[in-house]
Amino acid sequence: MRGVNVLKIILRYIPIAILFLVLAACATAPRQEICPSGTQDLPGCPPLNAIDDAEINEIYEKRTWYPAKDIDEDLIKLGKQAEIPVQHARTKFLGPSPHDAIDSLAVKLWMIENAEHTIDFTYDIFKTDLIGYAMLGAMCEAVWRGVDVRVTIDSAGSISGGTHSALRALGTCADNAGFMRNSEGQLTTKKARVQVVVFNAVSKPSNPNRRSHDKLLVKDGSFEEKSAVITGGRNI
């Protein structure tokens, strides 16, 4: 019964994934929306009731991806110097059994479905099978409701046919993205994005052993009362 319920959830997101793949194949250059200062009741612009929220603005900027050559700060040094607060949290371990694997998948989809502000999704191996498309569909739907999404996938782990094009297609979901909400649930002027990074592309000269083995999904990471993390040995 557990597997049947999870399968129903997976199948619900497959049409969304197929839709954005088709739209991406047909898309021309994206139309740039011109939004006058403030909020305007225009397509692609913040709604009239949106607010300019300082906390969301800061989170938005910190989450923006920049090429390494454009970053002046030593991020490793900053990480070593960072004072990371110890927070109390509940932890649940999922084992290696087939039932645990189904639970792990269900938890991942639940986290994406229930994210209110941000999603960070980073995995070593990502394949465009039934599960992969379900994850992409769920993230696409999240962007539509105003959740800012970041995806990092290792190049070697995602080298299977169609994976990179599917990840690029995920970016088209941002064409109809909603606007982010602050901690009080109010709409802000920041439009949700999809940022996809393929780590250490195999098409570029590099150390073949310099791979990312991260397996991490973070929901609402900057909002303590809403945040959740799943990590471990399972890829997608």
Predicted region positions:
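Hydrophobic helical h-region of N-terminal Sec-dependent signal peptides
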Residues: 15-20
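HKD-type phospholipase D/PLD-like phosphodiesterase module
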Residues: 26-27, 31-118, 125-236
